[in-house]
């Protein structure tokens, strides 16, 4: 039985537990946000990118876009991330392009390679990593990855990523009766909301987005991932497409359905097979042998590529992905323009308090 169906079936038992859990999380939030809490406030601005629900929502592409934005402006940011599944030799662990996904985690390694001017720090205690960066690196600003519930580091801006389902069937459904980590009151902290969806889906969602998110008084932006080409994993070769040849899609991410839609839209035809692995899957030799026997071109996500590149002899391609912003609610400005203006205001505010 699917998790959501099981939660619906057990709702009479789970809903009371959810209310208790949501109340505990609200108390926790009030404690960490109080002036008396031991939360760490760096001397430079902190931008949190997080989500209300568990699972993949598109946080990493948004973090990647912000890092690219910083690089084009000569800014050196520091990313504070837990590094899901990482086994770093020391903490905090400053990720470099030479490290492995096992050491750094798949997403931190991908971010570090795509943005070499950024300091990507893996540490389950992000407050400790922030203090280390404050002393050793002096970054221009901090990005708190998956930071909505990580309140031990104070933030100036809270960018909250939502899935379409979060504003539909899962709205307000807190663990264990739903997928939300906190109750709807936590959304009051948001500086802006983001929904990873195509413009068509976002337009269809607009009425419910306005009804449920308008009370928070902040803009809602849409974004999606658009491939600009294919890159050979472990090499430098590039190509635009497979010339109509069949392909097998490989993904171990939180939203495999969206990966399939992206691939089909890019190639103009669906994969002959979609090999779906769990999120953050640690690929092993058996997986690679199975993939090598597929008999078609193999294409994977960049997140999977950093884990599969170590296997020699696997003819594998990955997407060169770009984050694209679309329609918005609550502002006439496209997100890049809104962000430039919001960042300039934050920089002035922090300069005035330093």
UniProtKB/Swiss-Prot annotation:
One of the protein's GO biological processes: lipopolysaccharide core region biosynthetic process
The keyword tRNA processing is annotated on this UniProt entry: no
Binding site residues for ATP: 53-60
One GO molecular-function entry: ATP binding
The protein's Enzyme Commission number: 2.7.1.130
Catalyzed reactions per annotation: a lipid A disaccharide + ATP = a lipid IVA + ADP + H(+)
InterPro entries associated with the record: LpxK (IPR003758), P-loop_NTPase (IPR027417)
Protein keywords: ATP-binding, Kinase, Lipid A biosynthesis, Lipid biosynthesis, Lipid metabolism, Nucleotide-binding, Transferase
Pathway membership: Glycolipid biosynthesis; lipid IV(A) biosynthesis; lipid IV(A) from (3R)-3-hydroxytetradecanoyl-[acyl-carrier-protein] and UDP-N-acetyl-alpha-D-glucosamine: step 6/6
GO cellular component, one term: plasma membrane
The family this protein is said to belong to: Belongs to the LpxK family.
Biological function: Transfers the gamma-phosphate of ATP to the 4'-position of a tetraacyldisaccharide 1-phosphate intermediate (termed DS-1-P) to form tetraacyldisaccharide 1,4'-bis-phosphate (lipid IVA).
NCBIfam families listed in its UniProt record: lpxK
Protein name: Tetraacyldisaccharide 4'-kinase
């Amino acid at each position: 039985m699917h998790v959501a169906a099981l939660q619906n079936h057990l709702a009479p038992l789970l809903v009371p537990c959810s209310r208790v859990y949501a109340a505990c999380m609200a108390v926790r939030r009030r404690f960490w946000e109080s002036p008396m809490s031991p939360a760490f406030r760096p001397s430079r601005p902190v931008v949190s990118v997080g989500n209300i629900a568990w699972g993949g929502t598109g946080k990493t592409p948004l973090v990647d876009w912000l890092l690219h934005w910083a690089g084009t402006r000569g800014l050196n940011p520091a990313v504070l991330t837990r590094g899901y599944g990482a086994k770093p030799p020391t903490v905090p662990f400053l990720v470099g392009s030479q490290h492995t996904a096992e050491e750094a985690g798949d997403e931190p390694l991908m971010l570090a390679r795509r943005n070499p001017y950024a300091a990507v720090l893996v540490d389950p205690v992000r407050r400790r990593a922030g203090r280390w960066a404050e002393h050793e690196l002096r970054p221009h600003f901090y990005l708190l990855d998956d930071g909505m519930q990580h309140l031990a580091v104070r933030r100036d801006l809270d960018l909250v990523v939502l899935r379409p389902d979060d504003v539909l069937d899962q709205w307000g459904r807190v663990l264990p009766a739903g997928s939300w980590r906190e109750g709807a009151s936590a959304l009051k902290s948001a500086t802006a909301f983001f929904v990873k969806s195509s413009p068509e889906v976002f337009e269809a969602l607009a009425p419910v987005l306005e009804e449920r998110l308008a009370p928070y008084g902040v803009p809602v932006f849409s974004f999606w991932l658009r491939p600009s080409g294919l890159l050979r994993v472990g090499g430098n070769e590039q190509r635009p497409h497979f010339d109509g040849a069949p392909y097998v899609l490989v993904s171990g991410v939180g939203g495999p359905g969206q990966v399939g839609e992206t691939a089909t839209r890019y190639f103009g035809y669906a994969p002959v097979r979609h090999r779906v692995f769990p999120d953050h899957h640690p690929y092993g030799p058996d997986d690679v042998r199975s993939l090598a026997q597929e008999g078609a071109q193999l294409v994977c996500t960049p997140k999977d590529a950093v884990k599969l590149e170590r296997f020699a002899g696997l003819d594998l391609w990955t997407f060169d992905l770009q984050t694209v912003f679309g329609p918005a609610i609550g502002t006439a400005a496209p997100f890049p323009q809104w962000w430039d203006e919001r960042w300039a205001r934050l920089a002035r505010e922090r300069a005035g308090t330093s």
